[in-house]
Amino acid sequence: MPSLSKEAALVHDALVARGLETPLRPPMDELDNETRKSLIAGHMTEIMQLLNLDLSDDSLMETPHRIAKMYVDEIFAGLDYANFPKITLIENKMKVDEMVTVRDITLTSTCEHHFVTIDGKATVAYIPKDYVIGLSKINRIVQFFAQRPQVQERLTQQILTALQTLLGTNNVAVSIDAVHYCVKARGIRDATSATTTTSLGGLFKSSQNTRQEFLRAVRHHP
């Protein structure tokens, strides 16, 4: 994978090794983003015409291009590891060995089954070993993996694996609570249910006390 940061390549390889990478076909050719957007816009034009929408209307005529730009540059930008966030690791000179938790990380993703919104929040915790990570980088890693067609279970495990790989420790935990619009806006149309997924590693899995400390943080209990 050319032109990737060392961190992005390490994370990608770890996900592939664990069978957690997003399903991607081998690229038939290397398309630049502008070509990709142009092709997507053409296909979206055909879809809208099949829905009998009038693309000569000034409200609709730019919609195929808007959708193409949104897909490539925004909501599916996490499919391209060139967009993996720049990671700042700091040597753990303070010998921090207690849980570090970031709560209420806002995430918006897209259900890969129906291409509609997943809207939720993540809580991420880790116990430092040799390094600590800049706190905003945790948010950015969550957002990177959310910017893909996803299932929530895989998203949770991808975030866990990425942080374990970067931090050099298994002691990482991730919990996501989200509303799926494929449930809320179609099908059963259940507007009140939410889905919670949790992925635990190291002490968060093996130690009941550590696991309970994390779960209390997820629930905002003191």
Swiss-Prot record:
Query: Some GO term, biological process aspect, for this entry: which one?
Result: one-carbon metabolic process
E.C. no: 3.5.4.16
> Can you say what this protein is called?
GTP cyclohydrolase 1
Q: Which family does it belong to?
A: Belongs to the GTP cyclohydrolase I family.
Q: Name one GO molecular function term.
A: GTP binding
Positions binding Zn(2+) in this chain are: C111, H114, C182
Sorted alphabetically, which InterPro entries does this protein's record hold?
GTP-CH-I_C/QueF, GTP-CH-I_N, GTP_CycHdrlase_I, GTP_CycHdrlase_I_CS, GTP_CycHdrlase_I_dom
